[in-house]
Amino acid sequence: MSGNTGERPFADIITSIRYWVIHSITIPSLFIAGWLFVSTGLAYDVFGTPRPNEYFTADRQEVPLITGRFNSLEQLNEITKSL
């Protein structure tokens, strides 16, 4: 026989007014915050990824591949110094 954990049943939680008062504000707020985070470009700055127009510069049109196993640090330094 299974025991009782003392938690409220899920059906009671999602049918309560308090749940929907809280979540009717938080769910849209999280969506809007995420949309602003991405659309303003802050996500690119926080995670350090290049913006779509920065993948290829006018000077460097080739794909920056690391091909050497033992001199990868030197290759990486050459690629990043041109950025």
UniProtKB/Swiss-Prot annotation:
It is found in: Plastid, Chloroplast thylakoid membrane. Its main location: plastid. This is Cytochrome b559 subunit alpha. It holds the Pfam family Cytochrom_B559. Heterodimer of an alpha subunit and a beta subunit. PSII is composed of 1 copy each of membrane proteins PsbA, PsbB, PsbC, PsbD, PsbE, PsbF, PsbH, PsbI, PsbJ, PsbK, PsbL, PsbM, PsbT, PsbX, PsbY, PsbZ, Psb30/Ycf12, at least 3 peripheral proteins of the oxygen-evolving complex and a large number of cofactors. It forms dimeric complexes. InterPro entries: PSII_cyt_b559_asu, PSII_cyt_b559_asu_sf, PSII_cyt_b559_CS, PSII_cyt_b559_N, PSII_cytb559_asu_lum. Its cofactor is heme b. The keyword Transmembrane helix applies. The keyword Repeat does not apply. With its partner (PsbF) binds heme. PSII binds additional chlorophylls, carotenoids and specific lipids. It comes from Chaetosphaeridium globosum. One of its GO terms (molecular function) is iron ion binding. It is a single-pass membrane protein. Belongs to the PsbE/PsbF family. The chain crosses the membrane at residues 21-35.
